[in-house]
């Protein structure tokens, strides 16, 4: 399955919520009518079945983190095999992806841009270049922009944008050195309350 490269507003309208696919310079509502379904006429949303609600929640989370269907299924199996709540384990695995950590630290303005930085070998982990977006970052790991990329305008702008919206508490960043520490894996209470992971667990449990 190919990665989606079409209009980001279309996905936000499909899920009826901000998926944080845009930089956040302007509020998503000023760019996308997320209350309306996709299409020219933005037809009214019909009443969903339980299955439809569960599926939409899975698609929403998958699109927020930019993960393909097969990858997402793999993360779920991994989460189900770990101790603790499967839904929380799933979100933590997604949060520990390198492209997501790069985004959380503010080196990329979106997760898609952060994924590109990783793929283009602009990011190092503990001093070693890593170009795999799905690489699992561990507590205490140092994630940094490599010397060759430190002066890229998009990284400078992304850091400014992150300073405006605020940085999450589980990362610590030196903006001058463009380096940060992944202090700890976030607890469920640290993550978005707009995600209902129990619906995803129900979907995969069928």
Swiss-Prot record:
Presence of the UniProt keyword Ribosomal protein in the record: yes
Signal peptide boundaries: none
Taxonomic superkingdom: Bacteria
SUPFAM superfamilies xref list: Alpha-L RNA-binding motif
Database matches in Pfam families: Ribosomal_S4, S4
Keyword set, alphabetical order: Ribonucleoprotein, Ribosomal protein, RNA-binding, rRNA-binding
InterPro entries in the record: Ribosomal_uS4, Ribosomal_uS4_bac-type, Ribosomal_uS4_CS, Ribosomal_uS4_N, S4_RNA-bd, S4_RNA-bd_sf
S4 RNA-binding domain: residues covered: 96-156
One MF term in the entry's GO annotations: rRNA binding
UniProt record, GO biological process: ribosomal small subunit biogenesis; translation
One Gene Ontology cellular component annotation held by this UniProt entry: small ribosomal subunit
UniProt record similarity statement: Belongs to the universal ribosomal protein uS4 family.
HAMAP family (UniProt xref): Ribosomal_uS4_B
UniProt cross-references to PANTHER family, sorted A to Z: 30S 40S RIBOSOMAL PROTEIN, SMALL RIBOSOMAL SUBUNIT PROTEIN US4M
Subunit field text: Part of the 30S ribosomal subunit. Contacts protein S5. The interaction surface between S4 and S5 is involved in control of translational fidelity.
Function: One of the primary rRNA binding proteins, it binds directly to 16S rRNA where it nucleates assembly of the body of the 30S subunit. With S5 and S12 plays an important role in translational accuracy.
Name this polypeptide is given: Small ribosomal subunit protein uS4
Lineage: Bacteria, Pseudomonadati, Pseudomonadota, Gammaproteobacteria, Pseudomonadales
């Amino acid at each position: 399955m190919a990665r989606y490269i079409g209009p980001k507003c279309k996905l936000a309208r499909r899920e009826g919520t901000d998926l944080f696919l845009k930089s956040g310079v302007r509020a998503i509502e000023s760019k996308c009518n997320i209350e309306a379904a996709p299409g020219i006429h933005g037809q009214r949303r019909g009443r969903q079945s339980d299955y439809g609600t569960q599926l939409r929640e899975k698609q929403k989370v998958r699109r927020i983190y930019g993960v393909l269907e097969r990858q997402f299924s793999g993360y779920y199996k991994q989460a189900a095999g770990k101790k603790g709540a499967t839904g929380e384990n799933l979100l933590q695995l997604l949060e520990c992806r390198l492209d997501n950590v790069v985004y959380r630290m503010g080196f990329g303005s979106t997760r898609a841009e952060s994924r590109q930085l990783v793929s283009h070998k602009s990011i190092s982990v503990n001093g070693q270049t890593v170009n795999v977006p799905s690489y699992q970052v561990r507590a205490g790991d140092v994630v940094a922009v490599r010397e060759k990329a430190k002066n890229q305008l998009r990284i400078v702008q992304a850091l400014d944008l992150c300073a405006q919206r605020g940085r999450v508490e589980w990362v610590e960043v030196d903006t001058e050195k463009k380096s940060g520490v992944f202090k700890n894996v976030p607890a469920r209470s640290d993550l978005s309350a707009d995600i209902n992971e129990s619906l995803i667990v129900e979907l995969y449990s069928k």
